C-alpha cells in the first residue's frame, strides 16, 4: 500500500458483532438492562483498528434482510444456521445509533450481504485512488486482496488479527492467488454457509488441485486424471463445484456508493458521542474516543506522559550511584516506587543478555541494566553481590514501599520458584502494608472482569490514553519500552486505585486479606510439590492400555472402526445419524450437528452402554493428557512441580491454580485419586491435609440466623440427616441413605441459589417434586428464605452482593431483560455471601498459619490450597503439633453463631491424605 494515497477502512459489521458477542461475556448491560457485550467488543476492536492503522475514513457495512442475491442461486444458502441470539439481535440497532453519533457512514441494501458491500467498496475505493482495508473475519474476502486492498482478518477473539496481502494469501493457500479463492471454495465448499463444494475435498486437497492445474476450470477439464474416490466425487459433482464457486464469489456491484473525498474520520461531536456512550453505560471508552479529536467539542482525554529515563548499566558507577541515590531518597521520604523487571531483549543488547529493572518514582523513570559485562560498582547502602537488580529490589522490599502489576512475580526475583536456586530473601520478611499490586486492586473493584490490560487501567482510573509502546503497531521512533510504560503507569495508578477502594469499601479486603496473602503465595509456589516421574510414566502406560480397550469396545458397538471418538462432529454423526439415539430436546451446534457435550451424554448414558463408554474414554483421556503426560515435564531442578496461584481470576474471590492446575484434579473419582498417588512428601515427611467441614452451610446458618439451622450445627447433629427429617417429615432415626442424599443435595443447592430445575436435574426427579422439596426446605428453615430474599433485593438495589468482609461482586445480570440471565444474577447474589466469605476466611487462615509456621520454628511447609483445604509437607515428628496449630488457626479465624470445624488427615502420598 502507498503512503501517499488516502486509506479507508470498511468494517464488516455483522462479522465483528458476531465475533464480539461470543468473545465478551454476557455480563454487560446498559442502565436500562439492555445487553451491550457485543457493542463493547465491537468498539474495542474499532478503537484498536483506528490506533493501528489511523485510516482517513471509516465505513461499516451490514447485511439487510435475507441474502436474496445468493439464495436465488442456491436456495439452501445459510439455511442450516440457527436464528440469531435475541441478545445479539437487540444490539444491532444500538450499534448503528452509536455509529451515527460517531459520524461513521453505514452502508446496507435490501437483499445484499455485507460481504458484497465490502467488495463493492473495495473496487470503488481502488478506482478513486484509495488504499482500502477490509476488516472482517470471513476468509472468502481474501479474493478481494490486491496491491491496494488488504484484508484485516480478525481471528481468535478480538485481539488476534492478520493483515492479508497478495503475498500472504498466496502463502496461506500454498500458491493460490486471491483471484483463485472462489475456485478454492468451489472445490472445498463452505459448511458455515451451506455451500456444497465437492464431497471429500478438504482445504489441502483443494489447494493442491488448483495449484497443480491452475484454476477450477482446468481441474474440471482434467477431472479424468484425478484418481480414486476424489476423482469419482469430482466428476460426479462438477455442477456443484461451478455453482459453489459462483456463490462464493464476492459481488462488486452492490447498489451502494460513497463520496470518498467528503468522508473522513474522526469527524464527530464529542458531546453526541459522550451522550450515546453514557446511554449505553459504556463510559470506560469515552476518553479513548474523545482523544481521537483532541478535545474539540468536549473534554478529551490527555495522553499519558512517559517521563525521561536515566539509564544505568551495572558497571557505570556514576549512573548507578544516581539511581541508588534516588532509591534512597524515596525510601527516606516514604514514597511509592513502581518496579518492573524486563526480560525482553532491549535494542542493542547482545543476544538478549541484558535484563532491566525499571523504576518509576516521583522524579522520573530509571533503568538498571544487568548483563554479563562485569561486577557492579559498590554503592553505600546496597548489596550488589548478586547483581544490581537483586540489590535494589532487596532494599526496596525491606525498607521501601513497592508497587507492581505482578507483585508475586517481583518477589520471585529474590525467591525463585525453583527451590534448587538460591533464595536471597524470604517473602514473609516483606511487610504487606508496604506493597501494592495494582492489578489485584483493580480486580477487587471489578472482579467479573477477565482482563486488566494497561489501556483499560489508564482509561478507567486516569482518564488518559496510553501512548503506543515500542514494537506495537503505530509506535513512533521515540516510543517507550513496554516495561518502562508499565512502570510509569503503575506508579500513577496507586493513588486513584487507593481512592476508589476507599470509596467502594474495598480497602479492608485489599489491606487485610489480599496483600498479606501475596508473600504467602510466593513462598508456597517456591515450596512446590514432589512428584515421581516414574510413577507418572507407569500410570500413563497403564491408562493408555485401558483407553485402547475402551476405544475398541466403542467401535464394536458403533460398527465403525475408523471414526474419531474425539471429534464432536463425527461422534454426533455416529450416535444420532447412524445408531439413531434419541435427539428430542437436543440442540444443534452452529456447524449443524447435535451437541455431544457432557450434559447431553450424561443424560443418554443411563440407557446406552456406548455413551457410558464414551464418557469413560473422555475421563481417562483427559486424565492422561492433562496430568499423567504433563506433570513430569513441568518438574523443575528440585524435582518438584510449582503451580502458580492466581488472585485475579475468579469472580468469587477464590484462588485458582495454573501451570499446572492442581485444584482441578478430580477428587471424587478413582482416576483422580490415582493421579494423586504420584505426589509424595519428602523423605521423613508426610502429607497433612486440613479441610473446613461444610463451611458454606455453616456460613449460611450464621448469616441467616435461622434458629433451627444454628441449633443443628451447635449441637453437632448430622446436619443432612436433620434436614431430611425436617423436609420429609420422618424421625431422624428413620432417615434412609437415599433421603439423606436428597437432603444433602438440597442443602448445597440452596447455598448455590439452585432452583427447582437445577435440583430436578441433579436428583433426576420431576420439576414438581423438586419444587415441593425446596418449598418444604424453606418451611423447615424460614430464616434462610428471608435471608436469601433480602440478599437478592439488596443486590438489585445496589448492583452488588458482598461478603462478611466487604468483598463486593457486581452483578449486572440482575438488570438483564433476559430471564435466564436475570435468574443467573439472582443465584449469584444468593451464593456470594457464603462462597465469597469462605474464600476470605481461607485466605486469612493461610496468612495466619504461614506466620505461625515461621514464628514457632516449624520445618513443615504449606504447599497447596484447594478451595477449603490446606495441604502441608510435614516431618513425621511435627504432625501432632502442626495439626493442633493449623486447626486452631482455621477454626478461630472468625467468631460465628456456629463453630467452624477443620478436619485433618495424613498420608505418605497426597492420595493417602484424604
What is each PLM-predicted segment?
Residues 2-4, 26-29, 79-256:
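Extended two-metal-dependent nuclease catalytic cores across DNA- and RNA-processing enzymes
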Residues 360, 445-468, 482-490, 647-732:
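Function-dense linear segments that define catalytic or interfacial modules
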Residues 545-552, 556, 560-609, 779-827, ...:
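C-terminal polymerase-core module
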Residues 523-526, 635-636, 642-643, 647-650, ...:
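Conserved catalytic core of nucleic-acid polymerases
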Residues 237-380, 485-667, 686, 696, ...:
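Conserved "right-hand" nucleotidyltransferase catalytic core of DNA-directed polymerases
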Residues 184-219, 462-539, 743-748, 753-758, ...:
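Acidic, Mg2+-coordinating catalytic module of metal-dependent nucleases/exonucleases
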